């Protein structure tokens, strides 16, 4: 299975450091996790919702990763999430879910619904899990946002 990331070149390393420093929808502060998406287009959308249109970086890269089919992928089903889980203001329950998954070390990959497009999926990758090393990362490729995204 192939997953994608879009990020600034300086943050291309799949170490979960950005998520550890700032937290995210699915992780609390001090919990390293690598965020990826099921498609490059979803990765772009997930990136765009966090960028200031006036400060869009020019050093973006896309990075593909291949998750071996033999690797366990756990899933959080949309129907099991609390009401309002997509709201940007109420992420604590999701952060606890994701952080507990990281701590439990039950798998290196967790499939979660996208808050932007709930029928599509993002993937949390646990860099502390022993199977994380089996994920194969392609080299970062320069990526430019179409200027229409920033209008």
Outline where the language-model segments fall.
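Short, solvent-exposed amphipathic alpha-helical segments in soluble enzyme
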Residues: 21-23, 48-53, 126-128
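Active-site and NAD+-binding cores of ADP-ribose-processing enzymes
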Residues: 2-15, 56-151
């Amino acid at each position: 299975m192939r997953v994608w990331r879009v990020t600034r070149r300086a943050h291309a390393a799949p170490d979960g450091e950005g998520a550890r420093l700032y937290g995210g929808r699915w992780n609390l502060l001090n919990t390293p996790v690598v965020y990826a998406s099921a498609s490059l287009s979803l990765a772009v959308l997930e990136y765009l919702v966090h960028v200031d249109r006036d400060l869009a970086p020019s050093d973006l890269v896309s990075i593909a990763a291949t998750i071996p089919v033999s690797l366990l992928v756990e899933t959080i089903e949309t129907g099991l999430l609390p009401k309002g889980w997509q709201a940007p203001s109420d992420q604590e329950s999701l952060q606890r879910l994701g952080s507990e998954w990281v701590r439990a070390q039950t798998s290196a990959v967790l499939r979660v619904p996208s808050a932007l497009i709930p029928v599509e999926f993002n993937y949390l990758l646990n860099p502390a899990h022993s199977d994380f090393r089996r994920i194969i990362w392609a080299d970062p490729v320069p990526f430019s946002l179409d200027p229409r995204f920033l209008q």
